[in-house]
């Protein structure tokens, strides 16, 4: 329902802006559109987190994150195309109605979160949703997942019914596990903004115009397009490499890109006293070096912060998931506002090299936080990840929990193999056919090497 409400705000905001004939109307439209963006930014990743299978949850959230830079690429391309068209900006904003209306029409076909259904007491539908999320799982595995979710919802419901909203707010900051989890996702959101990436999007036209590009409006396609490509690569790797693994690999690339920008801007701006001058024609080689540094920086950003910050719901307990996601997203937009407002002033006072040096310092602090305080959630269910922060920041506990999860999965698989072998023996006995140890070993090896369900294999064997 919350996503549908966001769609309504998207639609109204886009219509108001596209039909604006006064600045106040445009401002009102932007505010309404911003409310829709803020709501969707919180709810969409949370919904995906609760309805996606554990094995591909990262990729599912990544798809959502991918469409952010993809939308930016489309918007930049359309903006460049209508730059010289009379009232072309109206068309640009009017097109924003299309995805919101489309989602309004199609959202009816999506399932509700099973945890929300359990919360409402609709356990039959919740079990059905779990079966649709895990279509190849056995009944025992579905029962296990349902039982874990049911116990967790019961515990969190008891907490919410016994306390008021403000009592829960106080409890969040007094309870170490809640405080650490919300701090983790909030710091990650802040780091994703304070590295300066979004300044490349907001001021790409201005920046690339200063660098001498003939069509500055197309400049936004360079960072946005690179970001979209590497978000796609990152989301395809996230469930294999892991969230923490991608951060440890991708952020150093981003840091090297910032160093590249510092050096590139230093030599580029030497003839103009270290500052960018709109009236000066810069050396094309140096311009190319700077653009290369920007692209290299965006490669690292696309692999990491661009989509991993939206995995925030994974790290939050159910009872603080909405509140924590709201806090983290608010931190994101506040940091975004601070960087956006100060960027051009920083270029004029600190020089471009100094500005990117400042972003480098903030990014190093963010990376240090990732190294020591950002645990891995790969292979863990949404009901298990919130346990990571019970005693500390969960980096070591994550390793132990994932090891235990693999052992549990192996026990389930061994139980299925044993059941299949028993059924095979019984079927052969009914046919009065003896089974040699060698034949049984061969059958078991076939089960282990086949990814299909044992029940299917038994049918074919008999």
From Swiss-Prot:
Induction: Induced during sexual reproduction. Expressed during infection.
Transmembrane regions listed in the UniProt entry: 1-21, 31-51, 61-81, 91-111, 194-214, 218-238, 245-265, 289-309, 324-344, 354-374
GO molecular function: myo-inositol transmembrane transporter activity
One family name in Pfam for this protein: Sugar_tr
A cellular component annotation (GO) from this entry: plasma membrane
Keywords: Cell membrane, Membrane, Transmembrane, Transmembrane helix, Transport
Localization per record: Cell membrane
UniProt record, GO biological process: myo-inositol import across plasma membrane
InterPro entries registered for this protein in UniProt: MFS_dom, MFS_sugar_transport-like, MFS_trans_sf, Myo-inositol_Transporter, Sugar/inositol_transpt, Sugar_transporter_CS
Catalysed transformations (reactions): myo-inositol(out) + H(+)(out) = myo-inositol(in) + H(+)(in)
Gene3D superfamilies according to UniProt: MFS general substrate transporter like domains
Topological category with respect to the lipid bilayer: Multi-pass membrane protein
Similarity comment text for this entry: Belongs to the major facilitator superfamily. Sugar transporter (TC 2.A.1.1) family.
Function recorded in the entry: Transporter for myo-inositol.
Protein name stated in the entry: Myo-inositol transporter 3B
Organism from which the protein derives: Cryptococcus neoformans var. grubii serotype A (strain H99 / ATCC 208821 / CBS 10515 / FGSC 9487)
Native organism taxonomy: Eukaryota, Fungi, Dikarya, Basidiomycota, Agaricomycotina
Gene (UniProt): ITR3B
